Every structure is written in structure tokens, then in C-alpha cells.
Amino acid sequence: MPTINQLIRIGRKSKKEKSNSPALKSCPQKRGVCTRVYTTTPKKPNSALRKVARVRLTNGIEVSSYIPGVGHNLQEHSVVLIRGGRVKDLPGVRYHIVRGTLDSVGVKDRKQARSKYGAKRPK
């Protein structure tokens, strides 16, 4: 516990807020190249095969990122755009791939929540 004098001399240090997506380096999105595309199983109460890609970003950092939506066209050397946002049941996956940009194609036959999956408006 500091004395009043110590507080007047030095003051209190403010706590630094920790980022949930440090690899983005405070950018909204980052471009990267897929180094590996694979499926993983989620944590305990859930069961599925979640689609994940390992991506090397333009700043040299390599991260795991989730591929949302039904079906995808990504493979090794695909150029993708990445945004923050973790997947709760996949440990270590803190980023999402943005569908419908660069090499990532939007979800086919998507009627609702189209903007989240890069789907065009159906005719």
C-alpha cells in the first residue's frame, strides 16, 4: 500500500489491456497464405469435424483460423483474408477467414445471413 506522498510523486500505473487477436497488430483484417487446410474435432461436449486452415500472414506470423460456412474451396497456397474472432470449442483458433474475398469463395445457396458468408443475392 503506497503512502499519499508516493502516489503524488509517482502515481498509479494503468493496466495494459491484452488483445484477443494479437497477430492482427491492431488491424481490422490481414491477408495471408494457407500453409495447411485440415479438419479438427472440438472440445468435450461437442462432436464434429471443424474446418481449419493454418495461415501465414503478411507480417510473418502463422495462425490457425476457422473456415465458416458449408463447404469451401481452400487449399494450400490459397490467399485469404483473416479477421479476429475465436471459435469457442476449438482451442487455439482465434481467427476467422472472411468468405467471398480473395481466393475464398462465398457459401453456395445461402439465403439468410448472406453478408457473413460472402453470398450474392439470389435472383
UniProtKB/Swiss-Prot annotation:
Keywords: Methylation, Ribonucleoprotein, Ribosomal protein, RNA-binding, rRNA-binding, tRNA-binding
Pfam families: Ribosom_S12_S23 (PF00164)
PROSITE patterns according to UniProt: RIBOSOMAL_S12 (PS00055)
Keyword RNA-binding listed: yes
InterPro entries (alphabetical): NA-bd_OB-fold, Ribosomal_uS12, Ribosomal_uS12_bac
Domain of life: Bacteria
GO terms under cellular component: small ribosomal subunit
Any GO MF annotation of the entry: structural constituent of ribosome
Residue stretches spanning the membrane: none
Chain positions found as 3-methylthioaspartic acid: 89
One of the GO biological process terms: translation
Family membership: Belongs to the universal ribosomal protein uS12 family.
Function: With S4 and S5 plays an important role in translational accuracy.
Subunit field text: Part of the 30S ribosomal subunit. Contacts proteins S8 and S17. May interact with IF1 in the 30S initiation complex.
Protein name: Small ribosomal subunit protein uS12
